[in-house]
């Protein structure tokens, strides 16, 4: 086991806080509409330019191990806030730094860190309750666009495209962000259900321009095993052929003789068919096949339920208005499923979302809900260079998370004003001891810090602006983008309540841990001996005859 170095009391805290300051000072330069960019070196490829707090935080690793403890703890604040609320990472970092710096002064002056923490917790609870009172629900498309614009560093085009996407697929719908091919942002909306499986043979294509197999008013056969023997399929194929309608086959796989027969019939125009593999794997595949069956009004033909392929009838097949099968995706538009059955299925999946323990499972379940309930919107981010693409894509993703948070818990006035207005609720508090009162006082000062940082980044005098805003009421605040004092909600300067709340709670949590730490232990780096010099070249090779 490697030797350790241990530091106690102020010696440990001072070194750790040095690390907190290095990370926080790098991150906080990005805050506000006039925040600056940070350039991140990459071991491979071009450097990344970003104005995203969590991207900056994730890149910072300090050489001094005690300083690195501080940096990693604040990095954790940024990451947690990003995971929970999707935005507010810079605000959380600024708050954590302010609480730690103020708190250390009290600890050095002999205040009890545990009581300080209790005071901090009381003040944070009061501030959170006040934020909930200030919060107003987001209802209009314009408000969604405003929240998205603020989170995307005042880029109105990003706010608008997110609002359009939410209009089209609903607030529950899935919105994904992908690299675009042009210079402008584009929005693609897939109505109905899309899954990531394409045709099993290019011979199924009947629309060469779009390179898709388009089926109008088709039947849908859903089978949970492989199909290789055409005899199993013949009875159902004959029934479909008599109805003169196309057929989509979704199965674990269609291969050999069965696939060849389908292709030949398709080319000859005897029966218009297309075959695709079932989406997903294992239990998720079963669930997705069931979703498709409910959406199209069919059933999953499965031996587990005592059904067989050769006895399948038209009543057991699903139906849809139109299905398009591309090389990689299949889209089912306007399935013939019963709306009550679809609603019941969505309700059932929502229960599973609440019980899901992993983020991955939750995300996949939410995708299933969206596919059943609304559709999928894809925002394609356009940019001139790869560096710009990465930076812009990160901003779009941030803005998307922020708008979701706003829809969830509502919005408050942005620009650091909501936290400043929470001061009154904190000022009315009284702790059980003088040390707890010091913790409350500490938060009173810390909640000013986001506004101070926004103003400093805009090149103005922070104390003057803070006093002017404190003399106003309600949503009156400083708009750093225009340099004016105004009603921020009317101007569209909004922050999601969830983002502001999460930033404060996470910052206070980690800062309290640092203040109550009395020792720090790190591993001593081994001084490895220098490598011996390389031996000289091999002698005696001169006389060799080639």
From Swiss-Prot:
Question: InterPro entries attached here?
Answer: Chaperonin_Cpn60_CS, Cpn60/GroEL, Cpn60/GroEL/TCP-1, GroEL-like_apical_dom_sf, GROEL-like_equatorial_sf, TCP-1-like_intermed_sf
The record, for PROSITE patterns, names: CHAPERONINS_CPN60
The EC number(s) this enzyme carries: 5.6.1.7
GO biological process, alphabetically ordered:
protein refolding
Keywords recorded for this protein, A-Z:
ATP-binding, Chaperone, Cytoplasm, Isomerase, Nucleotide-binding
Q: Report one GO cellular component.
A: cytoplasm
List all Gly residues biased stretches.
Answer: 536-546
* Catalytic activity reported: ATP + H2O + a folded polypeptide = ADP + phosphate + an unfolded polypeptide
One of the entry's Gene Ontology molecular-function terms is: unfolded protein binding
Q: Where in the cell is it found?
A: Cytoplasm
Coiled coil: which residue ranges? none
Region Disordered: what ranges? 527-546
Question: Pfam families attached here?
Answer: Cpn60_TCP1
Which enzyme type, at the first EC level? isomerase
Q: Chief location of this protein?
A: cytoplasm
State the superkingdom. Answer: Bacteria
Where, in this chain's numbering, is ATP bound? 30-33, 51, 87-91, 415, 479-481, 495
Q: Which family does it belong to?
A: Belongs to the chaperonin (HSP60) family.
Q: How does it assemble?
A: Forms a cylinder of 14 subunits composed of two heptameric rings stacked back-to-back. Interacts with the co-chaperonin GroES.
**What is known about what this protein does?**
Together with its co-chaperonin GroES, plays an essential role in assisting protein folding. The GroEL-GroES system forms a nano-cage that allows encapsulation of the non-native substrate proteins and provides a physical environment optimized to promote and accelerate protein folding.
- Protein's name in the database: Chaperonin GroEL
- Species name for this entry? Bordetella petrii (strain ATCC BAA-461 / DSM 12804 / CCUG 43448)
Gene from which the chain derives: groEL
């Amino acid at each position: 086991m490697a030797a350790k170095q241990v530091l106690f009391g102020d010696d440990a805290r001072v070194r750790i806080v040095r690390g907190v300051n290095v990370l926080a000072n790098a991150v906080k330069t990005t805050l506000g509409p006039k925040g600056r960019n940070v350039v991140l070196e990459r071991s491979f490829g071009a450097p990344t330019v970003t104005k995203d707090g969590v991207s900056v935080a994730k890149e910072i690793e300090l050489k001094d191990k005690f300083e690195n403890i501080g940096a990693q703890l604040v990095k954790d604040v940024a990451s947690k806030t990003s995971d929970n609320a999707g935005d507010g990472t810079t605000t959380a970092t600024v708050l954590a730094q302010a609480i730690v710096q103020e708190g250390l002064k009290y600890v050095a002056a002999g205040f009890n860190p545990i009581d300080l923490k209790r005071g901090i917790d009381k003040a944070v609870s009061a501030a959170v309750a006040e934020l909930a009172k200030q919060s107003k629900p987001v209802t209009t498309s314009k408000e969604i666009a405003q929240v998205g614009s603020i989170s995307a560093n005042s880029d109105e085009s990003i706010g608008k495209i997110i609002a359009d996407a939410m209009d089209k697929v609903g607030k529950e719908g899935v919105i994904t962000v992908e690299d675009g091919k042009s210079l402008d942002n584009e929005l693609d909306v897939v109505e109905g259900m899309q899954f990531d499986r394409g045709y099993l043979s290019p011979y199924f294509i009947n629309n060469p321009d779009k390179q898709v197999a388009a089926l109008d008013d088709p039947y849908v056969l859903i089978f949970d095993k492989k199909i290789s023997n055409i005899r199993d399929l013949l009875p159902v194929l004959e029934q479909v052929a008599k109805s003169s309608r196309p057929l989509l086959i979704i199965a674990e796989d269609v291969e050999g003789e069965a696939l060849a027969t389908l292709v030949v019939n398709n080319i000859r125009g005897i029966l218009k068919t297309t075959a695709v593999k079932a989406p997903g794997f294992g239990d998720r595949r079963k669930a997705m096949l069931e979703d498709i069956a409910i959406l199209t009004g069919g059933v999953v033909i499965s031996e587990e339920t005592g059904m067989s392929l050769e006895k399948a009838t038209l009543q057991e097949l699903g139906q849809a208005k139109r299905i398009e099968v591309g090389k990689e995706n299949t889209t089912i538009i306007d399935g013939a499923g019963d709306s009550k059955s679809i609603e019941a299925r969505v309700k059932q999946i929502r229960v599973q979302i609440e019980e899901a323990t992993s983020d991955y499972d939750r995300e996949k379940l939410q995708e299933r809900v969206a596919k059943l309930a609304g559709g999928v919107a894809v925002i394609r981010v356009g940019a001139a260079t790869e560096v710009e693409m990465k930076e812009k894509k990160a901003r779009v993703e941030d803005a998307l998370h922020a708008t979701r948070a706003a829809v969830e818990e509502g919005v408050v006035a942005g620009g650091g004003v909501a936290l400043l207005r929470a001061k009154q609720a904190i000022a009315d508090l009284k702790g059980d001891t003088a040390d707890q009162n010091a913790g409350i006082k500490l938060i009173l000062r810390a909640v000013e810090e986001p506004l101070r940082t926004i103003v400093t980044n805009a090149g103005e005098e922070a104390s003057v602006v803070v006093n002017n805003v404190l003399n106003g009421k309600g949503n009156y605040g400083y708009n750093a983008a225009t340099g004016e004092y105004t009603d921020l909600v009317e101007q569209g300067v909004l922050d999601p309540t969830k983002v502001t709340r999460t930033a404060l709670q996470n910052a206070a949590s980690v800062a309290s841990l640092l203040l109550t730490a009395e020792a720090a232990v790190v591993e001593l780096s081994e001084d490895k001996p220098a490598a011996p010099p390389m031996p000289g070249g091999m002698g005696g090779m001169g006389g060799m005859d080639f």
